[in-house]
Regions:
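Beta1/beta-strand and adjacent pyrophosphate-binding region of the FAD-binding site
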Residues: 1-11, 29
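Dinucleotide-binding Rossmann-like beta1-alpha1 core, especially the glycine-rich loop
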Residues: 51-133
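Glycine-rich FAD pyrophosphate-binding loop
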Residues: 20-43
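Short, well-ordered coil/turn residues at beta-beta hairpins
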Residues: 7, 51, 196, 203, ...
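C-terminal lid/capping helical subdomain adjacent to the catalytic/cofactor pocket in oxidative enzymes
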Residues: 18, 22, 338-343, 349-430
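Active-site substrate-recognition segment that forms the wall
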Residues: 46, 87-95, 182-184, 190, ...
Length: 430
C-alpha cells in the first residue's frame, strides 16, 4: 500500500477519504480490529460540534493567539461535514439544530451571561435565554436560563454516519479490512509493516487512528487514558409526554456542571441521556466488560427524572458505556514516529465527532507533506502533559473526580488541587 490507516473510526475513515480525494491513484488500505464504528464512534452521544478545542474556553485558555483561527476553521469544518453528508446522501439523521447549555445553579447563570461577551469578539454568535424562554423551548423545573449556540452544533446517529463514510471510502477505492487487529509495527528501511493476526500490510506511510484503544506506540500510553462514559436511551415518548416537555427545536442540550449531562432527542422519538460519570479503570483498563457495566445507570436515571419529573414512569430501553480517549489538554494532538513514517492523532476527549475530520486532515497534511495553514497552528505542534505512571495516575484521576464533584456541590468553587491543575494546564474531562 501507499498509505496504511490503522483504525476504522471517524478519524481513520475521514483520513482515507481525504487521501483518496487528494490523490485518487494512492493505494490506501484501512485495517480495523473489529468492525467499522464498533468503538467510540458508534457508541457516542451523537453531538457534532464545530469546536476543535473541546469548547471555546479551553481553546482560549490554551491557544489565545490562535483561537480566532481555530474558531473559524471549526465552523468551516462543520459546514463542510454537513455538505458532505448532503452531497453523499448519507442517511444518519443529521440535524443542524444548535445546542443549549443550561444553567441549573445561580452561579452558572452569571458565568454563562459573562461568557457571551467574552466569546463575541472571536466570532461566537451566542444567545442568552432567560428562564421563561429556556423552559418554553424545553420544560424542566431545574432550568434557570441557557446559553444557546444556534449554528455550531448538529446532532446525528453516529454509527450510521460512520457506515456512510465507510461506503464513500469504498467507492473511492479504499481497501478496508475489518476484524484485522494490528498487534505490532515493524520499521524496516523506508517502510513500516503492520502485523495482524492473519497477515501483514507494508507501506511507506502509516496513520495510527486508534484513539482510546490500547496504543501501538509506547509513548501514547502516557498521553491518553481510556475513560468510560455511559448513555441511557428511553422508550419512545407519547405525544402527550412530548407536549409536556416541548423540545420543538430538537436542540442538543448540556448542563454546565463540571460533571455534566448531555442529551438529545432521537429521530424515532426517544431521548438519549448520557454523561456525568467518567469512569477510569486501574492501569488504563479497557475491554468489552466495561461497556456492559451498569454501575452508573441508576444515578443517570435519577438525574433524568430530577430534570424531567413530568416523565416519571418512562422506561429506559437501552444503555451502554463507551471508551473516550482523554488527555490532559482535552483536545486532539498529533505526533510522529519512525522517522516521520508514522503519524498519530488522539486525545479528542469526548468531543471528536466533528473534530475527527479536522484531525484526519492534519494527519494527511503531515503524511503527504502538504503545506497548509492547519500545520502552522500551535495546537498542531504541541503535545499534552503526560499522565504519571500508576498508581499515581489512578489516584490523581480519582481525586480529581472527587474534587470536581465537590465543586459542583459548592457553587463551582474549585479547591487547591483543581486550581493547581488549572495553573499547569492539566485536568481530567470527558
Amino acid at each position: 500500500a501507499d498509505l496504511l490507516i490503522v483504525g476504522g473510526g471517524f478519524t481513520g475513515l475521514w483520513a482515507a477519504i481525504e487521501a483518496k480525494e487528494h490523490n485518487p491513484n494512492l493505494d490506501v488500505v484501512l485495517v480495523e480490529g473489529n468492525a467499522v464504528a464498533r468503538g467510540a464512534w458508534g457508541q457516542n452521544g451523537g453531538f457534532v460540534s464545530a469546536s476543535l478545542t473541546h469548547g471555546f474556553s479551553n481553546g482560549l485558555d490554551r491557544w489565545p493567539n490562535d483561537i480566532a483561527k481555530l474558531t473559524q476553521l471549526g465552523q468551516q469544518n462543520l459546514n463542510e461535514m454537513e455538505q458532505f453528508v448532503i452531497d453523499r446522501k448519507i442517511d444518519c439523521d443529521w440535524m443542524r439544530v444548535g445546542e443549549m447549555d443550561v444553567a441549573t445553579e445561580e452561579y452558572q447563570v452569571t458565568e454563562l451571561q459573562e461568557f457571551v461577551e467574552v466569546a463575541k469578539p472571536y466570532g461566537e454568535e451566542l444567545v442568552w435565554l432567560d428562564q421563561a424562554e429556556t423552559r418554553r423551548r424545553l420544560n424542566s423545573p431545574t432550568y434557570l436560563g441557557a446559553l444557546f449556540d444556534p449554528d455550531s452544533v448538529a446532532i446525528c446517529d453516529p454509527a450510521r454516519l460512520a457506515w456512510g463514510l465507510r461506503d464513500v471510502a469504498l467507492s473511492l477505492g479504499v481497501r478496508i479490512y475489518e476484524h484485522s487487529k494490528v498487534v505490532d509495527l515493524d520499521e524496516r528501511g523506508d517502510r513500516v509493516t503492520a502485523k495482524t493476526e492473519f497477515g501483514s500490510v507494508t507501506a511507506p506511510k502509516v496513520l495510527l487512528a486508534t484513539n482510546a484503544f490500547p496504543p501501538l506506540l509506547r509513548r501514547l500510553k502516557y498521553l491518553i487514558v481510556p475513560v468510560y462514559d455511559s448513555v441511557l436511551v428511553t422508550e419512545p415518548l407519547s405525544e402527550q409526554q412530548r407536549r409536556d416537555i416541548g423540545w420543538a427545536g430538537n436542540e442538543g442540550v448540556g448542563d454546565t456542571g463540571n460533571q455534566f449531562h448531555y442529551y438529545r432527542p432521537t429521530a424515532d422519538g426517544r431521548i438519549l441521556w448520557g454523561g456525568y460519570d467518567a469512569t477510569y479503570h486501574f492501569r488504563s483498563g479497557f475491554g468489552v466488560q466495561h461497556e456492559h457495566s451498569t454501575k452508573s445507570w441508576p444515578k443517570l436515571a435519577t438525574h433524568f427524572f430530577s430534570t424531567f419529573p413530568q416523565l416519571e414512569g418512562l422506561r429506559f430501553e437501552y444503555g451502554w458505556s463507551g471508551a473516550i480517549d482523554t488527555c490532559t489538554r482535552f483536545s486532539a494532538f498529533w505526533g510522529t514516529a519512525m522517522d516521520d513514517k508514522v503519524v498519530y492523532v488522539a486525545g479528542y476527549t469526548g468531543l471528536g465527532v466533528g473534530a475527527s475530520r479536522f484531525g484526519a486532515q492534519v494527519s494527511i497534511d503531515k503524511l503527504l507533506d502538504r503545506d497548509t495553514d492547519r500545520r502552522k497552528l500551535e495546537m498542531v505542534n504541541t503535545l499534552p502533559i503526560p499522565f504519571p505512571p500508576e498508581p499515581f495516575k489512578s489516584a490523581g484521576i480519582n481525586f480529581t473526580r472527587w474534587s470536581l464533584d465537590k465543586a459542583d456541590r459548592n457553587q463551582g468553587k474549585r479547591n487547591i488541587w483543581l486550581r493547581t491543575l488549572d495553573r499547569f494546564g492539566m485536568g481530567f474531562d470527558s
